[in-house]
Amino acid sequence: MPNIKIFSGSSHQDLSQKIADRLGLELGKVVTKKFSNQETCVEIGESVRGEDVYIVQSGCGEINDNLMELLIMINACKIASASRVTAVIPCFPYARQDKKDKSRAPISAKLVANMLSVAGADHIITMDLHASQIQGFFDIPVDNLYAEPAVLKWIRENISEWRNCTIVSPDAGGAKRVTSIADRLNVDFALIHKERKKANEVDRMVLVGDVKDRVAILVDDMADTCGTICHAADKLLSAGATRVYAILTHGIFSGPVISRINNACFEAVVVTNTIPQEDKMKHCSKIQVIDISMILAEAIRRTHNGESVSYLFSHVPL
């Protein structure tokens, strides 16, 4: 693929390498380091003049440092005369701060959008934004890809009783997501209504739907401390579900999440690799990973060639 360069930030080099391999490319040379005062320094190690540049950096790990690193990499490529700079952000940082839900609350997702644009990004590729309206925070093109086709493929290949399952949303906000998956599998859906008083603390859960004598599959875009989905799993089991799975696009997994998952009644907690999971998997055999590198790689190929990416909304590329 001529006139294209792919660079990796520090957050998820394994995913970046998989994307490059699928495109038959080498990752571009870049050196990132910190000065003694903790300022980030980036050195692009090869010419990008006239190139179509893609920088892969996920919003995970040391989020603030990685975001700053991404901004500097974008700007470094832009002022080095790259023809176009696309930020490939599998898990978009600050996506949960997408609205003014109380007095004096910041809309930090909008701030991040502004920062990316000012740094010089011409295009954004991301996956399963926590709130789809974040696309409207940008004045540049944003392709919000979906993990749904890969999730459907995993369910059909790994859950033998998938025809006798119920797709469950752990909250009312995810109803659209689970109904889409349930419709494509031609199965029922349910949701759990939760009343929350404090952050990450669930006081009461009400199941709306039937899971008796069925496999229950909890689906959500992300999980952080996993308090909600672990309580939801208990609720589903007590309502008669035979087995419970959780499938999540972004496994943030912070705090005491490993012990919670190990002690929960899940058959498996399945996440995509928008965030690195290797260390977590060493301590929790229930965590399984769906590789989405082929989706991001195909989105990059289609973008570079001026083709539509809408095919990826319903298909997993080979």
Swiss-Prot record:
Catalytic activity annotation: D-ribose 5-phosphate + ATP = 5-phospho-alpha-D-ribose 1-diphosphate + AMP + H(+)
One Gene Ontology CC term in the entry: ribose phosphate diphosphokinase complex
Cofactor field: Mg(2+)
Regulation: Activated by magnesium and inorganic phosphate.
GO terms of molecular function: ATP binding; kinase activity; magnesium ion binding; protein homodimerization activity; ribose phosphate diphosphokinase activity
EC number: 2.7.6.1
CDD domains attached to this UniProt entry: PRTases_typeI (cd06223)
SUPFAM superfamilies named in the record: PRTase-like (SSF53271)
Residue positions binding Mg(2+): D128, H130, D139, D143
Keyword Nucleus: no
Any Gene Ontology biological process: ribonucleoside monophosphate biosynthetic process
Domain of life: Eukaryota
Region (Binding of phosphoribosylpyrophosphate): 212-227
Pathway the protein takes part in: Metabolic intermediate biosynthesis; 5-phospho-alpha-D-ribose 1-diphosphate biosynthesis; 5-phospho-alpha-D-ribose 1-diphosphate from D-ribose 5-phosphate (route I): step 1/1
Similarity comment: Belongs to the ribose-phosphate pyrophosphokinase family.
Quaternary context: Homodimer. The active form is probably a hexamer composed of 3 homodimers.
Listed PANTHER family: RIBOSE-PHOSPHATE DIPHOSPHOKINASE FAMILY MEMBER, RIBOSE-PHOSPHATE PYROPHOSPHOKINASE 1
Annotated function: Catalyzes the synthesis of phosphoribosylpyrophosphate (PRPP) that is essential for nucleotide synthesis.
NCBIfam families: PRK01259.1, ribP_PPkin
Entry protein name: Ribose-phosphate pyrophosphokinase 1
Source organism of this protein record: Macaca fascicularis (Crab-eating macaque)
